[in-house]
Regions:
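Short C-terminal tail/terminal secondary-structure segment
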Residues: 81-84, 234-253
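C-terminal helical subdomain
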Residues: 170, 178, 193-233, 240-242
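Active-site helix of classical SDR
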Residues: 110, 146, 154
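Active-site loop immediately N-terminal to the catalytic Tyr-X3-Lys motif
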Residues: 87-88, 135-142, 163-164, 210, ...
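Short, small/polar-rich loop/turn modules that mediate ligand/substrate recognition or access, typified
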Residues: 162, 167, 233-235
Length: 253
């Protein structure tokens, strides 16, 4: 591993990924951000691409190798919320897009990252799933299914690469305050007819701490998991959700 951590973050120009990038930079890392659009946080390199495209991902990792000289940490974070509604109203295109962005991209990035991490003598892979990938999530079946798949990929990869000093863990954020959660609530309000304010209140009541998670909370956990302090943490699914244990009990109540 290099003296200065070399970190690649997909979906790093906004939301959770941007918070991760800022946190790693503050921790002294060299950070490369990949996203479909946007501007990089200060101190980061940036590539604009679709990380569900295999050729584009190959080009990304070639550039990461040329720019940073290797890789120590992959944060496979990119994701979309997917369509909202009862399953009978969802179309195949929405399902396929959600799986491509949320699952295919993680696979493509991991298969390129592992050889680079082995060459570096070890490292860390962090995949971003969701509490929806543990509990399920009514009205969001494509998203929940994709996030279950991310956990399966992460757990399996941890078994495969631990012997090479590569640790693989999964972050499961709860409802994250920001534009994406706002859009999800608005879409659900349109489908269900429930006012936006009531839905937001219901989401908050599902959490023991009665507030949404912030990107910086997930970013802090990412920096820890990539650090030597977490050198024996591997194959774990870690929720950063404020205690979101009541979702199953509030559906349709």
């Amino acid at each position: 591993m290099a003296d200065q951590q070399r970190v690649l973050i997909t979906g790093g120009a906004s939301g959770i990924g941007r918070a991760m990038a800022e946190a790693f930079v503050a921790d002294g890392a060299r950070v490369y951000v990949a996203d479909v659009a946007g501007d990089p946080p200060d101190g980061c390199d940036l590539s604009i691409l679709d990380v569900s495209d295999a050729d584009a991902v190959d080009g990304l990792f070639d550039d990461v190798a040329a720019t940073m000289g290797g890789l120590d940490v992959l944060c496979a974070n990119v994701g979309i919320a997917g369509p909202v509604g009862p399953i009978e109203d969802l179309d195949v295109e929405g399902w396929d897009l959600t799986m491509a962005v949320n699952v295919r991209s993680a696979f493509l990035c991991c298969r390129r990252a592992v050889p680079m991490l082995r060459e570096a003598g070890g490292g860390s892979i962090l995949l971003t799933s969701s509490t929806a990938g543990v509990t399920g999530f009514p009205m969001r079946s494509p998203y929940a299914a994709s996030k279950y798949a991310v956990i399966g990929l992460s757990d399996t990869l941890a078994m495969e690469v631990g012997e090479f000093g590569i640790r693989v863990n999964t972050l499961c954020p709860g409802s994250v305050d920001g534009d994406r959660m706002r859009r999800v609530i608005e879409a659900e309000a349109e489908v269900t007819g429930v006012p936006v304010a009531d839905l937001r209140g219901a989401y908050e009541k599902q959490v023991s701490m009665r507030t949404f998670v912030e990107g910086r909370d997930i970013a802090a956990m990412a920096v820890f998991l990539a650090s030597p302090a977490a050198r024996y943490v591997n194959g774990q699914t870690i929720a950063v959700d404020g205690g979101l244990e009541t979702l199953r009990n509030t559906w349709r109540t």
